[in-house]
Amino acid sequence: MSLTRLRRIGLPIVAAIAVSAAVAAPATAAAGAALSSGTFTTWQKAQAAAGFVLYRPTSTYGLRNVGHIIVSACEVAGGANKRIVSIGYGTFNTKSLALTQDDANGPCGNGYAGTSLGTYRIHGIKAQLWGYCGFDNLPSCSSTKIELWLMWQHKADYYTASSYNEARSRLLHFASTLRQV
């Protein structure tokens, strides 16, 4: 993969999935159990491992899950008791939607190299839309062939819904139709 391609794929979800998948062993978690990391096939098991309330997508526009739900430690927060939960749909070569959520009172990654594209409301909470576009020979910010990140925070929980090669309206709908597990 070329350096240009690596720089272009700057989604926090890519880093979270790659690192988590490489180091996470399958884990089992029961309600009330200590926080754990791993890959999970159900939202209920992932929520038990994460130790905080999760939200799951209700609409993925036909994009298939690219793996399991990944729960890992939030390294940026500096505490082993904070978790980040990641899931992706589609492929990063064609179209994709992804969701990360953490309980670290902020993002668990550095994804701010982009252009601010506006402010929206997700479940009544102000969210900032960012795009990897409009500078350094990147596509125009009006193109759908760009990476978009929609970020918002509710209390100590931080959310990032992201997309590649999807219309803004789809990313906004993806985020606004999240439902509590």
Task: List each language-model region with its residue ranges.
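Primarily hydrophobic membrane-targeting regions of prokaryotic envelope proteins
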Residues: R5, A24, W149-M151, S162, ...
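Secretory targeting and sorting signals
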Residues: M1-A31
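Long alpha-helical scaffolds
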Residues: A27-A29, A127-Q128, A175-V181
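Serine/proline-rich low-complexity intrinsically disordered segments, especially terminal tails, linkers
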Residues: T4, A22, G88, A98, ...
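Positively charged, low-complexity intrinsically disordered regions
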Residues: L6-I9, N65, Q180
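Short, solvent-exposed recognition patches
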Residues: G32-K155
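Surface-exposed amphipathic alpha-helical segments
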Residues: K155-V181
